[in-house]
Design a protein with these regions (language model features):
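Extracytoplasmic/periplasmic substrate-recognition and gating elements
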Residues: 100, 104, 110, 290, ...
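A structural signal for short loop-to-beta-strand junctions that line the ligand-binding cleft
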Residues: 128, 136, 166-202, 231-234, ...
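Extracytoplasmic/periplasmic solute-binding protein
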Residues: 180-189, 195, 219-269
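C-terminal capping/gating helix-and-loop segments adjacent to ligand/active sites or protein-protein/ligand interfaces
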Residues: 409-415, 430-487
Length: 492
């Protein structure tokens, strides 16, 4: 076990930084909004959901499960400790139902399910790992923390199970995000949480604009919007991670995943001062100077909905934000949202595309949540029987049709499994689903991927960038120094 690496993570977790940011806050907002909508929905909607489940959910029955190609679980008693973050309904009851169905079909297995609050979850998980009490099955998100769990010996390699036995037809991007060093480290569930551009269709029609597909076209739209009296982008960067969305997408469009991956390792010349990062920074500061963002972006709060308000009152025409904003805007004013708001994927960098840079890397998380497994015998070998049971639970019960239809109907989730798009009713969410279904990979939010100490530096750099306090070279040097320090701590 790499105890030093865990200590570094624990320090960051106790500071409360690992969960801060766009990915985690977005997932919470989307779920709570959807839950509120569902609670207020009529029994007719619930009946429709039930009908849809019954028409497609044969996989949840014991007979159908037994007919599948699944690993063997012995008749010997097994106890699985399981940690999740489903503390409120409908998610809590949906998870518990899946677990109960599994135990009914596998009576020799007892699942001790623990629901933990999201805010302190990572801190509690690392404490459990450090004290030898890591659960057998636990929620993870991918990125830097999962990599450290894997390196520290708390993650089973699921590649052989996944390659040889039945599983849901996950998006390629979801499996890629759950893979570390070529080994599958997590089974996704609960869908995606992605980033996209919201735009006011009414304003676009008024100004005579088409949805831009390249960054050059996007900048042309911005100039025409400015000329018509509109601020192109709504942005509330008081939380800092909101501005990072522009930075992440511009880097991804200019270099795919390559330059970020190199900067993360700080190997073979990798640096946050590399060409893509400086180019993205220069582009953002050019947009700031041209007035593409509201005045005082660093003092506006997304938690208070100030970015959405600038869309509602017609001040701004576009907003780059997380997919959870679909639910937030719908809740605020369903009629206005339906009539006025559309979404499109972040435009491509035509020059980079001509040079062979992939333009289908999206930003967000292709695994809203996932399960990783920690099934080992006392001698350090894999407890294959328990691992088989965990794999079946995660792929055939959590992730069966009944479970997934509840996620769509009751929580407005966009799943990362092929074949469910037909059940999405929100046209904008259909677009989000298509964007991430077609993605070759998903760049996890930097503030979830980076070590905790680097995350804080990165977020502060976004304030400096949008405030024109420092340029791309300068903030890149700050991020490099933080990354090098974090790597030194984890390796010492």
């Amino acid at each position: 076990m790499n105890k030093k690496a865990l200590a570094v993570i624990l320090t960051g977790a106790m500071a409360g930084t690992l969960l801060a940011g766009c990915g985690s806050s977005g997932s919470t907002t989307a779920s709570s909004t959807a839950a509120s909508d569902s609670a207020a929905a009529s029994t007719e909607a619930a009946a429709a959901a039930s009908t849809a489940v019954e028409s497609t959910a044969a996989e949840s029955s014991a007979s159908d499960t037994s007919s599948k190609n699944l690993p063997e679980v012995s008749s010997d008693p097994i106890t699985i400790t399981m940690w999740d973050i489903a503390t409120e309904d409908p998610g809590k009851s949906t998870m518990e139902t899946a677990v109960q169905e599994f135990m009914k079909d596998y009576p020799q297995v007892t699942v001790e399910e623990n629901h933990l609050q999201n805010d302190n979850y990572k801190q509690q998980l690392v404490v459990a790992m450090s004290s030898g009490q890591c659960p057998d099955m636990y929620v993870s998100w991918g990125g830097g923390p999962l990599t450290e769990y894997y390196k520290s010996g708390f993650v089973n390699d699921l590649s052989d199970l996944y390659n040889n036995y039945d599983h849901p037809d996950f998006f390629d991007s979801a499996i890629a995000q759950g893979t570390i060093d070529g080994k599958l480290a997590a089974i996704p569930f609960n869908g995606i949480s992605g980033c996209c551009v919201y735009y006011n269709k009414t304003i676009f029609n008024e100004v005579g604009l088409e949805v831009p597909t390249t960054i050059d076209e996007l900048e042309d739209c911005c100039e025409k919007l400015k000329a018509a009296g509109y601020t192109p982008f709504s942005l509330a960067n008081g939380s800092k991670w909101t501005g990072s969305m522009y930075y992440m997408y511009l880097v991804a469009r200019h270099s795919g995943n390559d330059e970020f991956n190199a900067a993360y390792t700080q190997e073979n010349g990798g640096s946050f001062t590399s060409e893509a990062f400086v180019w993205a920074s220069d582009k953002i500061q050019d947009w700031v100077k041209k007035g593409y963002f509201p005045d005082g972006v660093n003092s506006l709060s997304t938690d208070d909905g100030q970015d959405r308000q600038l869309m509602y009152d017609g001040t701004c025409a576009m907003m780059l934000h997380g997919s959870w904003q679909c639910g937030s805007m719908y809740t605020d004013n369903a009629d206005w949202y339906t009539q006025n708001i559309g979404v499109f994927r972040f435009p491509e960098d035509a020059e980079a595309k001509a040079n062979g840079v992939p333009q289908d890397v999206e930003v967000g998380t292709a695994i809203d949540t996932a399960f990783s497994f920690n099934c080992w015998n006392s001698d350090g070998t894999v407890d294959q029987n328990k691992l088989n049971a965990c794999y079946i639970l995660a792929t055939q019960y959590i992730n069966n049709d009944e479970y997934n239809m509840k996620k769509i109907q009751l929580e407005n989730k966009v799943l990362n499994i092929n074949g469910y798009d037909q059940y999405i009713t929100d046209e904008n969410m259909k677009t989000v689903n298509k964007i991430f279904q077609d993605a070759s990979n998903v760049q996890l939010w930097y503030d979830q991927y980076l070590p905790a100490s680097v995350t804080e530096v990165h977020k502060n750099c976004m304030t400096e960038l949008f405030g024109l306090e420092k340029n791309g070279q300068e903030i890149g040097e700050e991020e490099d120094a933080a990354m090098q320090a974090a790597l030194a701590d984890s390796n010492s």
